[in-house]
């Protein structure tokens, strides 16, 4: 049994290589890991939502319509029976971690037991060592714990054999997760999204927040200041590209704890020290900081990409792809198909990289600050083609909670179902929501109301299209939306009040585009982007209402905001006698 902090990260990398869970690549520090694969429809390459269950009491089974729940005693009986003997013949690694900076009021300790040295190596890149912190518990059981086993292994490299018995059961009452018959990090790394769920449960039964947020420092030119922003974006809505904008710094890319601080602000910490990121479409043009880190010598785990002559390749990397190599399906060649006749891509669409944030040249110096950083603004990113402007500011904190609770993400590919369907994603957290949504929203309201200096809240939409189907935003335009939001937190810009929130004035955006992007921002662009589309916005309110009507105990303030916004939009329609109102008319 290997444990404590004495078995350093290098030791677990070496053991993972010895056991075949990882293999060395050409660049020093780079390794490759492959997860199990039987076909494009049957694999261990992504989170298994079907077999991820939240264990609750019998009386709570109907409180969580958006997640899988199971009666606790039944679930424990099932998963413990499957886990009986699951580590036979394996080594068990015992690891002590700290979720958040060391010696911080924010942080929660976490214990991981696993028989995978790949999991142990990944967690050492992603989390802070916590053995010394555990010694200071003095017998307290106030920590999360996670038990994981890959189960019976097969093949070379060794992968989980019995995917049909894959289980990831989250025991809220005990503050633990039991995970078996899997290796993919989203299922096996207890401290990742599994700990996010435990954190949400704990925070919402206390007086703080656990959120699916990035944390970044925003640095306007010539201002000699840093404003810190958090942001929640559903998948494919611009989260990473926002957090990694040029000239800015990153504290964290995924999960944050927030507390009311003595200076009157909400302060936030990154509970992690690394990034477990989707590698698809990371390239030198769009993601220069990450791409440089991934193509230079440093400790990095690649998973489920193609390896050719010791070099990793992935979908959308901007390079000429080889016609053959080794990937998650074994020996790969262009045109290879699985047992069902489905084409196997060069790398899995959910292929990943694991790296310490300190390896990025835009890391913020406050990454390990035990006091966290003051939150000046919060961004909620949605995706729709015809409704929301590129950015709006909430009218107040409660309206900001409403904006976060109203995030929609539009499906973009037929492989995900019907294209163009709006999916509700409150705070980009719905998949991890282990408390009733009404309680979660009410706690957000109460949290902000306890602050003397509550963050300004903004909603973004980088995917608005013209009637001809052309995107109205350039890829880097989001830098100007962010800097406008930063200026609003510092009271530098005026704004136009609309029924859905505050929108920028043209002159301010024109100046930002000129200064930061060297672009002429036209009145035509401004008009198209910030027109209030009444019919579309009313339809959005109808969708929100339909979703929340399925929930119990949604707080009154939420319904009041929704109703008032509907009234105000209809009044605007009557005033101008048309469906689309230009921002110039509202001024």
Per-segment meaning from a language model:
Residues 207-210, 216-226:
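Phosphate-binding P-loop
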Residues 150-212:
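Charged, amphipathic alpha-helical linker segments immediately N-terminal to NTP-binding catalytic cores
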Residues 1, 91-94, 213-215, 226-230, ...:
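Beta-sheet entry/capping signal
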Residues 100-102, 201, 219-223, 235-237, ...:
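Short, glycine-/Ser/Thr-/acidic-enriched flexible segments
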Residues 109-116, 246-248, 264-275, 283-286, ...:
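Short secondary-structure boundary/capping segments
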Residues 88-90, 95-156:
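A contiguous, mid-domain pocket- or channel-lining segment that forms the substrate-recognition surface
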Residues 4-50, 56-61, 75-79, 86-92, ...:
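Conserved NTP phosphate-binding and transfer environment spanning the P-loop NTPase/kinase superfamily
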Residues 208, 225-309:
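Catalytic or ion-translocation cores adjacent to nucleophile or general acid/base/metal-coordination motifs
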């Amino acid at each position: 049994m290997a444990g404590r902090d004495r078995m350093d990260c290098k030791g677990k990398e070496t053991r993972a290589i010895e056991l075949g869970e990882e293999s060395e690549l050409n660049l020093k520090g780079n390794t490759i890991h492959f997860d199990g694969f039987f076909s494009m429809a049957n694999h261990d390459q992504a989170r298994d939502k079907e077999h991820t269950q939240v264990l609750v009491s019998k009386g709570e089974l109907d409180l969580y319509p958006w997640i899988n729940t199971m009666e606790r005693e039944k679930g424990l009986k099932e998963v413990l029976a499957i886990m009986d003997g699951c580590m036979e013949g394996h080594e068990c690694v015992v690891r002590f971690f700290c979720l958040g900076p060391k010696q911080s009021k924010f942080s929660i300790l976490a214990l991981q037991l696993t028989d995978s040295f790949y999991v142990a190596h990944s967690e050492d890149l992603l989390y802070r060592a916590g053995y010394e912190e555990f010694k200071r518990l003095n017998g307290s059981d106030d920590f999360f714990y996670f038990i994981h086993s890959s189960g019976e292994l097969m093949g070379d490299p060794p992968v989980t054999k019995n995917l049909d018995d894959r289980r990831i059961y989250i025991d809220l009452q005990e503050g633990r997760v039991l995970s078996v018959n899997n290796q993919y990090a989203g299922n096996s790394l207890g401290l990742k999204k599994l700990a996010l769920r435990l954190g949400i449960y704990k925070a919402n039964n206390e007086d703080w927040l656990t959120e699916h947020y990035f944390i970044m420092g925003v640095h306007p030119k010539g201002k000699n200041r840093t404003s810190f922003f958090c942001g929640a974006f559903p998948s494919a809505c611009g989260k990473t590209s926002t957090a990694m904008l040029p000239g800015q710094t990153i504290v964290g890319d995924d999960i944050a704890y927030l507390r009311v601080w003595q200076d009157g602000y909400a302060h936030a910490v990154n509970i992690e020290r690394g990034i477990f990121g989707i590698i698809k479409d990371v390239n030198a043009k769009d993601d220069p900081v990450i791409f440089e880190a991934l193509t230079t010598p440093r400790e990095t785990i690649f998973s489920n990409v193609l390896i050719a002559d010791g070099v990793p390749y992935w979908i959308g990397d901007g390079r000429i792809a080889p016609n053959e190599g080794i990937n998650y399906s074994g020996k790969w060649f262009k045109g290879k198909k699985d047992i069902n006749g489905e084409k196997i891509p060069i790398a899995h669409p959910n292929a990943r990289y694991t790296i310490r944030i300190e390896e990025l040249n835009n890391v913020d110096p406050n990454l390990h600050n035990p006091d966290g950083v003051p939150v000046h603004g919060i961004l909620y990113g949605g995706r729709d083609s015809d409704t929301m402007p590129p950015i709006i500011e909430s009218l107040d904190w409660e309206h900001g909670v409403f904006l976060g609770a109203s995030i929609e993400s539009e499906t973009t590919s037929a492989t995900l179902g019907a294209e163009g369907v709006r999916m509700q994603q409150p705070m980009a957290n719905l998949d991890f929501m282990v408390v009733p949504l009404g309680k979660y929203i009410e706690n957000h309201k109460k949290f902000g109301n306890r602050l003397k200096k509550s963050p300004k809240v903004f909603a973004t939409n980088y995917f608005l299209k013209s009637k001809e189907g052309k995107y109205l935003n350039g890829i880097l335009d989001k830098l100007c939306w962010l800097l406008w939001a930063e200026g609003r937190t510092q009271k530098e810009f005026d704004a136009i009040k609309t029924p859905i929130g505050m929108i920028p004035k043209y002159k301010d955006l024109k100046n930002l585009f000129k200064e930061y992007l060297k672009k002429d921002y036209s009145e035509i662009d401004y008009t198209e982007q910030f027109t209030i589309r009444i019919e579309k916005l009313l339809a959005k309110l109808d969708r929100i209402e339909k979703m929340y009507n399925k929930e119990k105990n949604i707080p009154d303030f939420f319904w009041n905001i929704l109703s008032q916004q509907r009234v105000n939009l209809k009044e605007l329609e009557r005033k101008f006698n048309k469906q689309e109102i230009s921002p110039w008319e509202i001024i």
